[in-house]
Amino acid sequence: LRMNFFKHIFLGFIFTAITLTVNNYVFAQETDVSSRQIDEIIVTSRKTEENIQDVPIAVYAVDEKALDDFRPTTMRDLDSLAPNLQVGMNTASGNQGAIFVRGCGYAEVEKTQNPPVGLIVDGLFLGTNTGTLLDAFDWSKIQVNSGPQGVVYGKNTSCGNVVVERNKPSKDFEVDTEVSIGNYEAYELGLILNIPINDKVSSRWNFRKLAHQGYYDNLFTEQDSGQLDIAAASARFLIEATENTEIYIVTDYYYDRGDTAPVSYSGNPFGAGCVPNFGAGLGLVGAADNGCTPGLGAVTATELSTAGAAIGITPFAAFAGLEPFFSQTEALPPHVVNLDNPEQSDMDFIRGSIEIVSDTLIGEVTIATSYLQLDDNVLQDFDATPGIAGGQGNPATLGGPLHTARNQHFSQFSQEIRVSNDITDKLNLTTGIFLWKDSIMLQQHSGGVVQTSGQDTESVAIFALVKYDVTDD
């Protein structure tokens, strides 16, 4: 027994040694490969091109090869791609992102606030989270900078930002296509044309189309719901004006004709045939044995009717005998909805920008001018029930419809002038001025009431960034 014991101990040591040796070898190989990949990643977290290992802030970058392997379809697919990055969709609009970094972000629909996680595409900061779920086509790099970033990158980006860079035009002729199909009548079409115009001017043209019929079954319309219908076109020009000056022009057009995220009814929490006690202020108390969910103070539809009839409130009096109208207590199955109002999310998005970079006697001068215009029209059924026509109502709205319609117009203009200069071999100074102007107009249609509001914003920022290398390495 003792010999067998020592034999097992000896074999265990040998097995452990072999395992550690193999693991160390594999780890060393992976480390070498990882190091080579990291060395090749250049980021612009401080407005200058630097190796990611030399940047003293929390930054995560994904290069073109990794993007090709990952194959994201839209910005939504980047959810959790980087540590502490969440990319969700706002349910009140089909193309409205809810981007969070380290748990900090903005998930509301209003454009009166700039999102604290900025999205920057080819140098253009998007001043709203509408339209941020862009198609992920011809991307060359994604960079996630943890916040705060408002001083150097973006407006009010206290939580951080996501920087997207697309491939710039090159001097080589290139044609690239992409076609894919799937279930639910899903398809993706993509076309890339890189056309050199002459020795100094190159152009790159993109077209992208994404669509599917929707993953939800609508019981009321007997049709599919939640469809996707997005198209995007881009033309980019790179001009080598002189040996020291480069001009980059970007134009984009996006449109979205899909559906908003369908709202599914989760059942009547007050109990079958019961509604909230909207007559509590009138002294209404439901019977103890009325069958409603205890602790919620709910009453039956007839009890609410009795209270209304007693004091002559006609809307309450009309609920007599309507218990079957509020009888559904179970949630609908997954991917099943029962909506009587169209789900619509229309968006038109145009942008144009020009960036001039020139090496001068005072350093590298960058002049960036951009304009963006966005129009969207969103219809949504928030009560998630078909109402009288479908024989089922939402007790929270007393069976009435809660349908919203939002027409919004947003435009922004920005101008940035930046100078980066190496004062010495170790000291770099970047200074600049950023001008911003945006305009918002909103019309809200709910319950037959039209509300119109607007806001204009102008702001100016002056910034400076000093970088000093303490050591030679």
Report each predicted region and the residues it spans.
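Transmembrane beta-barrel outer-membrane domains
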Residues: 36, 92, 132, 155, ...
